[in-house]
């Protein structure tokens, strides 16, 4: 795993409560970008630890708060890629993974 990153997760979690905003039998848990989980191994990530913490409901991060742009910046750093140089076209527009957002490398995740 020295040169391979194994990642399991997504850019957002799910709310820790069941919602029914429509008044019909349409129950579910909406997206939650304020509290989410990732599992990573190898490729320069620190082994055997956790980073961050949510409130007692699992709704919002309360310790070592990061967002998905920070996580993407950290991945790109470990891959040796510059976030503003890695581009792709979408609907005729050059895009970057961070989409102009100020993602920062998360030192606490690095080995």
Regions found by a protein language model. Give the residues of each.
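Ligand-binding pockets and gating/stacking loops
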Residues: 1-111
